Amino acid sequence: MASKKLGADFHGTFSYLDDVPFKTGDKFKTPAKVGLPIGFSLPDCLQVVREVQYDFSLEKKTIEWAEEIKKIEEAEREAECKIAEAEAKVNSKSGPEGDSKMSFSKTHSTATMPPPINPILASLQHNSILTPTRVSSSATKQKVLSPPHIKADFNLADFECEEDPFDNLELKTIDEKEELRNILVGTTGPIMAQLLDNNLPRGGSGSVLQDEEVLASLERATLDFKPLHKPNGFITLPQLGNCEKMSLSSKVSLPPIPAVSNIKSLSFPKLDSDDSNQKTAKLASTFHSTSCLRNGTFQNSLKPSTQSSASELNGHHTLGLSALNLDSGTEMPALTSSQMPSLSVLSVCTEESSPPNTGPTVTPPNFSVSQVPNMPSCPQAYSELQMLSPSERQCVETVVNMGYSYECVLRAMKKKGENIEQILDYLFAHGQLCEKGFDPLLVEEALEMHQCSEEKMMEFLQLMSKFKEMGFELKDIKEVLLLHNNDQDNALEDLMARAGAS
């Protein structure tokens, strides 16, 4: 009883879904009632069926048609049987005479009719095309012996592969050393070729020179006999009057600069020269950097450099002494601005420099060459460089050695700090926009306002250039574009209103 009561409690009239509203779709709603037109009434189906009288005329016609087809087929069979019996009787009566007549008629018919093109297909009929047939030996012989019918205007050779002219070409391997020797003979004379022949390793001999010696000899010979070669990074390091040219690639350790310096010049060959007989040491271009005389004294040159500057050397900035990797293990104190004379423009000593100065000399203390910065050409940039801290100066030197000028690097460092990546990004974007023809001042304004969006920078520069050509002031243009977010129409209206008010 208890179980029945529990079941009645849960499954009786009570439900958890009572008084819960539900939204049902249109397809679950009861359809609306449709009213029939006045006077419409359905006929009684039973009465209609009773009144219909079916005569089965179509079925009767179908049966009659089938019986007629059977009669026609039986008549055809009887006619075929009669014809076969008549032929059998004629053959039995005629005997050998009939056979000869039949064979004569067959040969006559075959002689008059032309032979079929394909006897196998000609023997097939439409009703027996799927039945297998035996191939007669005469047909195969006729097919084999019959010559192919070739048209006069058809040439099979036209469709054959033509000979490739490269098939008969003899491939030869290139002897790189032989080609190099021929090139050097034509450009630098027989001495270079003789040097190369002496340095080439002989087969089967134990006297094989090392790669470094060969490279060093080639570099020395190239500098001696090719003075018009492009700047290739060779540094003239004369040792007490004897100029010895060494490559940056060779590992050279430079000692600290003593009171009497052995370094007389740090130079690069010129890019262009008319006199091909001059030595490479005489073609040293003057650049702005620290230099010393033969007796170790520093010279303050107040005259501007008349020769080509460092930026003219193939588009690269001149490498200062800081570019050289020193192997010296001792750390030398840096030369401060108080210990150095005012080095506004320093010229490099060449081999044909003036005699040693007889006046009082200043002997600086020993310092690391890597701590001497490249001097900027602008005095203002030089003064700003002297005011920087050692870390900031190192950052500037790092970016300048990549090919940028001191002025641009100092300007970028003021805005981006000592982060080299941000400085390089700023300089790269600045250079790209300047190459597109925009004013450098406008480019700096755009980079300052829109640092992250290249599209907005381009739009800002185009509008700035357009409004500047119209005659508006740059200050007003900048304020208006910043206020209206580069909206051309609103900015132009604002500029016109300001111009009218003024």
From Swiss-Prot:
It is linked to Spastic paraplegia 80, autosomal dominant: A form of spastic paraplegia, a neurodegenerative disorder characterized by a slow, gradual, progressive weakness and spasticity of the lower limbs. Rate of progression and the severity of symptoms are quite variable. Initial symptoms may include difficulty with balance, weakness and stiffness in the legs, muscle spasms, and dragging the toes when walking. In some forms of the disorder, bladder symptoms (such as incontinence) may appear, or the weakness and stiffness may spread to other parts of the body. It holds the Pfam family UBA_9. PROSITE patterns: UBA, UMA. Changing residue 59 to G: Abolishes association with the ESCRT-I complex. GO terms for molecular function: ubiquitin binding. The UMA domain mediates association with the ESCRT-I complex. The gene is UBAP1. Residues 86-117 are annotated as: Disordered. This is Ubiquitin-associated protein 1. GO terms for cellular component: cytoplasm; cytosol; endosome membrane; ESCRT I complex; intracellular membrane-bounded organelle; plasma membrane. It comes from Homo sapiens. The keyword Membrane does not apply.
